């Protein structure tokens, strides 16, 4: 970012939400002292202290004038991290972002990369707070169709879900589409979902025939998405989550109350379906082994080596 044309330590670096606080602090340490971030109360008229991105994006899309920003100075570099996928009115949101930057300014977008999840049918990608699921091609095409020129693009790799980063400038004359790098095959469809439902139920049925109990470990959005989309609520025997705030709550879609991991101690034949954060799987397995060494593991994530679909083939009688 600091190497962009016309950007120097006197440039104004800014952000639209709390998602940019850490990176703005990094800029400050590097000598960029002119910075601002949209204030929820002063700029967006948000008075609910428990607001989140769903409220921020809606307010940004609807505000006509950012009066305080006019006084602070429009941005040379506006950073917009992990909010675009939450937008209800993405056209209006992008139009209003343009009001926050100078004519020769830049916007840095960061969104989740869903391409591999589409190809692998990784259902836990889906989240009730996300309206859009971007691939490289759809992301770039959206920006170009919205009057931006893509100055820089990068796919930043992570262990589970990659990140798409685009630095754009204003270019209202450019409305071109890139037909290259299209998603080769859309595996996310009802036909494949029905196959996957069948595979999972058959696998669980075989495990239950061997007297294994099925325990869902973790009750975050990934676990709930997996359980409900693949319709395996009725095949779960135990729900475990060590978050004290969730204990004795009922898992949505079931009549099962959430309990803690101490209840795994005396179970002989138990299958743990890991629904925790992908990066936390090894840590959780290590923790469970201290409680019960007999436990076997599967994961809700397609990228995990404990993938529940692993080695399963579709064969319906």
Task: Name each model feature, range by range.
Residues 52-58, 125-128, 233-234, 257, ...:
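Short, hinge-like loop/turn segments at secondary-structure boundaries
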Residues 1-120, 133-148, 224-225, 230, ...:
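Conserved SAM-binding loop
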Residues 1-7, 22, 26, 165-317:
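Hydrophobic, well-ordered beta-alpha structural blocks that scaffold small-molecule cofactor pockets
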Residues 113-122, 159-163, 170:
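Flexible glycine/acidic-rich beta-alpha junction loops that bind and position SAM and/or redox cofactors
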Residues 148-158:
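Conserved S-adenosyl-L-methionine
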Residues 121-127, 184:
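Short glycine/proline- and charge-enriched loop/turn segments
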Residues 36, 56, 151, 259, ...:
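General small-molecule cofactor/ligand-binding pocket signal
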Residues 131-134, 155:
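Extended, H/D-rich, highly charged conserved domains that either
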């Amino acid at each position: 970012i600091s190497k962009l044309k016309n950007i120097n330590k006197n440039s104004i670096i800014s952000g639209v939400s709390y998602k940019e606080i850490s990176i703005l602090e990094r800029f400050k340490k590097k000598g960029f002292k002119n910075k601002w971030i949209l204030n929820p109360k002063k700029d967006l008229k948000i008075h609910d202290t428990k607001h989140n991105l769903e409220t921020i994006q809606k307010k940004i899309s609807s505000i006509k004038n950012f009066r305080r920003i006019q006084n602070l100075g429009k941005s040379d570099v506006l950073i917009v991290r992990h909010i675009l996928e939450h937008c209800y009115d993405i056209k209006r949101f992008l139009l209003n972002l343009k009001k926050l930057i100078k004519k020769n300014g830049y916007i840095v977008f960061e969104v989740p990369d869903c391409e591999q999840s589409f190809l692998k049918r990784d259902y836990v990608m889906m989240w009730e707070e996300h309206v859009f699921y971007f691939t490289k091609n759809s992301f770039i095409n959206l920006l170009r169709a919205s009057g931006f020129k893509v100055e820089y693009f990068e796919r930043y790799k992570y262990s589970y879900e990659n990140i798409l980063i685009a630095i754009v400038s204003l270019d209202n004359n450019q409305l071109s589409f890139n037909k290259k790098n299209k998603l080769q095959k859309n595996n996310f469809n009802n036909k494949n979902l029905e196959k996957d439902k069948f595979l999972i139920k058959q696998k669980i049925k075989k495990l239950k025939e061997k007297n294994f109990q099925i325990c869902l470990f973790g009750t975050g959005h990934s676990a709930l998405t997996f359980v409900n989309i693949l319709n395996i609520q009725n095949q779960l025997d135990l729900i475990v989550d060590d978050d004290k705030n969730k204990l004795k709550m009922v898992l949505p879609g079931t009549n099962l109350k959430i309990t803690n991991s101490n209840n795994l101690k005396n179970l002989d034949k138990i299958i743990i379906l890991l629904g925790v954060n992908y990066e936390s799987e090894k840590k959780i397995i290590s923790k469970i082994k201290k409680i019960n060494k007999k436990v076997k593991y599967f994961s809700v994530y397609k990228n995990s080596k404990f993938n529940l679909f692993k080695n399963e083939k579709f064969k319906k009688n």
